[in-house]
């Protein structure tokens, strides 16, 4: 030990870490119910009203703006980084399961976003993971056509080798969880008996890779999308195709029913279009939008069933609201620089207060509902693209941080005093103003013994 440093202690620096606690919202809801008060469908534009934010399901039809996940909260990544093709939340919403191209499962906390565990799940890339409706089982598929069934504690109970000849693209459970359907690049869909793991039917009809499939949440109806630009509806009892839809000029990327009612079907394609159909009216087209970039992944909001989110090839994330009347074919919210590369997967927490996104930039990013008044809401690098090394560690690490606004921000323009507070490198540092003691009533000369 150096005698010159003997007796000295190393100074430790602390930083704030964002944590999401949904229990406070449920406590507030319980208080309102107990005292017979009505839920407010809006939040006052005042920071003190942040404590009044309720759970997403408490707002009903009027909570679209409140429940939209627009605020970047945390960035997570494994030590050994790989592309992340699939995400899913555990049924209770406490953890996020992340699948990687090297066949691993990793678990992340859904509140503090800490890393919890990692395991080797498949010998090749894990391409899809799906929980049953009851949450008692999970099925995963890999790039070598293998399917595996897991318990909630990630104890593997069954392996189905060569379930498909090519990469498994999608898995979806029936409403009763007694069966599930899988699709693959081998041009077919297969229906499996969950209790014994045996194949029941093969749904043939597509002429190219089947990229997506989904089982209706209430009915015996399966939808699939393929590289042959076709959307097909199937009867799982007979295994026959009941209808074929045209209308796209390129590969169908994703087809998803509404998670609860199932009345609407959303479809995205590589022809840069997104469409929503009403299956109650012979698949009438209700919504259509065309973009300048490819849509890569799609996810419905679990609570607000008129809201869905798409991830794009350029790394942006866009929220759409079908109940919007002013501009029905425009996104209600756009996060232009959500990721540095193509977005590969989106997953909402079952409660609906957090959204996780994955990308080919090998990171997982968590997004939460915005607050009533947030001066830095649209001044994050995910909105203005002012990213430097480790930019995500510097976002609001100090709970009292006040950062200079850009033209992308929504705060008031800086005052004249802050304009004169420039650093040598041309940047400006803004410090919060402290009220003078002389402004307090009865304290004209300040407090004795204290200097400000």
From Swiss-Prot:
One of its GO terms (cellular component) is mRNA cleavage and polyadenylation specificity factor complex. PROSITE patterns: WD_REPEATS_2 (PS50082), WD_REPEATS_REGION (PS50294). WD repeats lie at residues 79-118, 121-160, 163-202, 205-244, 247-287, 290-330, 338-377. It is found in: Nucleus. Residues 443-452 have a biased composition (Gly residues). Pfam families: WD40. The keyword Repeat applies. Residues 409-452 are annotated as: Disordered. The keyword Phosphoprotein does not apply. Keywords: Chromosome partition, mRNA processing, Nucleus, Repeat, WD repeat. GO terms for biological process: chromosome segregation; mRNA 3'-end processing. Its main location: nucleus. Residues 416-426 have a biased composition (Polar residues). Required for 3'-end cleavage and polyadenylation of pre-mRNAs. Also involved in chromosome segregation where it has a role in chromosome attachment to the mitotic spindle. This is Polyadenylation factor subunit 2. It comes from Kluyveromyces lactis (strain ATCC 8585 / CBS 2359 / DSM 70799 / NBRC 1267 / NRRL Y-1140 / WM37).
